[in-house]
Amino acid sequence: MTTVDPITLEVVCEGMRAIVKEMRASIIRASFSSAIYELDDFSCALFNPQADMVAQSDDHPGHVMPMPWSVFCAMEDFSGQDGNEGIEPGDVILLNDAYRGGTHLNDVTLLYPVFVGGELFIFPAVRAHWADVCLLYTSDAADDTPCVDLGGR
């Protein structure tokens, strides 16, 4: 195992935290949704290629806690096995599956894999509340039973 001196470790950790804080500020600046710029109903994090969270912003635990599972499931789905292409530069993964790391269908996770030298380096991830994701008249319809009625999987 490689050891890292404490100063280098702290510089790298704070650098990753700064990236996540800048992600958060950029999303607020660019958002047209009051759920984001008024209610802060979103969360940001960075993940390594093994789906381990390496940095997160000070956000909602209900968003942040299940995000590693969402990233893991996305990596599993796009692993290059079972006939799929695998994750490649330029891909963007959008998911809201309540059974694979989602919270409810309106919390949509966006992953943008970043490659360095042709190798997957890091996954910036954002989970945000999307007010009207459903296929029916309202995303909170109490009489809907199948998950697909509320927004598709």
Tell where the protein language model's regions lie, with residue ranges.
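Short, Lys/Arg- and Gly-enriched loop/turn segments at beta-strand edges
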Residues: 101-107
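A short, hydrophobic, proline-anchored segment that marks a local hinge/packing element in signaling
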Residues: 109-116, 125
